[in-house]
Amino acid sequence: MFLGEKMAGDAFLKSIESNFQNAVRCLNATYENDQLGEDLATKIMVANSTYVVRFGVRLRGQLFTFTGYRSVHSEHFEPVKGGIRFAPDVNQDEVEALAALMSYKCALVEVPFGGSKGGLIIDPREWSEPELERITRRFTQELAKRDLIHPSQNVPAPDVGTGEREMAWMADEYKRLNPAELNAWACVTGKPVSKGGISGRTEATGRGVEYALRAFFDHPRDVAKTGLTPGLKGKRVIVQGLGNVGYHAALFLSTEDAALVTHVLERDGTIVDETGIDIAALRTHIMENGGVTGFPGHVASGMEMLEAEADILIPAAMELVITEDNAPNIRTPLIIEAANGPVSAEADVILRERGIVIIPDLYANAGGVTVSYFEWIKNLSRIRFGRLQRRAEEARFNALIDGIESMLGKSFPHDIAARAVDGGTEIDLVRSGLEDTMRNSYEVISKVWNDEKMASDLRTAAMMVAVRRIAQSYQTLGI
């Protein structure tokens, strides 16, 4: 691990802790008769445990040693939940910061999990698929020895460098190690649908970003603070990172909300098109060519394009991309954090002083863990969502339409009738549940932001809600 990578993880952890400490100060100033003591605050802030595992895998005629991490931040609810990332710059501070963020995120959107996070120091691009599978299965064995993967104790999910494939390997290895475990497939989420996954999980975080923006723009008082006009239609959007989250957020905003994605930043440059980028075509180009070079509108400029003029900035890649160095130059009145921790604590202060509104990560990217919760429930219940009620709903709506047609002596247009009687499929129910979660959560955050003097911004408001809920949970446990 390079020194710079360790320092970046340390800065990220300090940003999370700074946000927490600010929330505690604001809570104690707001609720004078319900103080959060320093002892309990410290208990909530620090990670309960962090495990470092080192294991060997014999590949290519030699023994390679790999280092992995799994941090458990808070067990006020179990199981604890959080992704596993495969990246060469994974470090303990980063993993602990992400685990803490998971605790606050779950509390904010009322998902009954504690926070956890894991990582493996590896560059997946350096290994073949069979080699990566062997490494992943060995890592799973090490986690399973310590109950760091378990359907009722610790449930991993995809993150940077991992996806459905890796989750299927991990679940299968856990099942092999625990053949009598009835709920074995609930040991991870983000699996392929064919292996107990849920429809809509892949798009969930990006879809949640879309729903978060819709919720924000449905609150005129909040929108007025940005100086933007109501509605997403025609809003110019910059997206940094077209991975899974950035791609789905950009795709849905452009195709369903008529927003204009004018800039997409990637490792090998930026695509610029003021009339709106074809996100699906760009994604195909990246998959076929390994980058954005050669796509219409390509310019060699990189991170400085975060400072381009637009209405909404969506950092959707890694943490700490907006720092005190570039924060003074950001020109979008609204930032929504699709990535975890993309804005440093120092940059956050600068942006707020400049009047820029930030929709924080612990709310904005909670779509992933929300739908992971739905998947976990599906695995425990062992039944697909909608299987019991879909046809009954269709029968009721058909009877209603038949009655109306009989009374009026007229027939419904076929397309309207078909939409009205169609029972909800699993993905319909998942999207409905996710939208309900994001809208209800924003209502709570917005109320605190607008009603409480100490909640000067959305991040502080969201952290106040999350920390208070965790504290109340601990207090009811007698801690």
Task: Show which residues each predicted segment covers.
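Adenosine-phosphate binding glycine-rich loop
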Residues: 3-10, 34, 216-217, 329, ...
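Short, Gly/Pro- and small/polar-rich lid/capping loops
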Residues: 6-54
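Glycine-rich, N-terminal phosphate-binding loop and its surrounding beta-alpha-beta segment
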Residues: 42, 49-124
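Glycine-rich phosphate/diphosphate-binding loop of Rossmann-like nucleotide-binding domains
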Residues: 196-309
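Rossmann-like adenosine-cofactor binding region
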Residues: 269-358, 363
